[in-house]
């Protein structure tokens, strides 16, 4: 059995955005699919995931299915493959309303048009009758957001929701999510690898590495004072505005193979601060400042940054 996630824990609060960041393959999307109950049947999940006090992992598949779309929803990376090409945009938004709010066909379609207006699709009544291939990438993603928020879910998971969009549309989509979050009080889990997006839109941050949580903090605290060497490396590798002709910083080494992960801290083979004890056991997630947690034996890192061990 291949272990993808190992002892992760986080909390998303109503009306706030929790960003989960990390390199590709670190387990960000797997964690979200586990919450939604969308992992393959042969996946084994242990622990608990609670929504408004209810244990999602203890529910039957039928009970979890009833919650999806009604009380928890997810926006995927690529709207063109997530939307059904055989149905119009309005029909796909209306489907959620008919299923979960028991509206008749006409009432659901009218509500769908109103929802498309809410996500700022111009001429929503006409666009509601168009098929996904007739819409731009930005409009398709807005339709996905309309579907996800149609029933005012308590939790919205946005998995790299702007990856396929240009920078201008990306900013519009993220601003829209912020506005709708404040309006509805929905808790948002934003999965991304873009630290600029995290800085602008997240309230809290979880940094993941190789299936484990490396650091967890308020967004402002994490950017001001990172307390895990991996986070330090991520922030150092982010290109600064106006950089020209300079070599980009990088984190030496490669992500470990989860089929045979290194003992102890999984970042130790790449860490400039690693000591022998780092390979002896998985470091616990420890509070190094109020509300700021790090899974590093050498945290807090005061006085160490910029100096290898």
At which residue positions do the language-model features occur?
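ABC transporter nucleotide-binding domains
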Residues: 1-226, 236, 300-309
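Short catalytic/signature loops enriched in Gly
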Residues: 122-126, 216-309
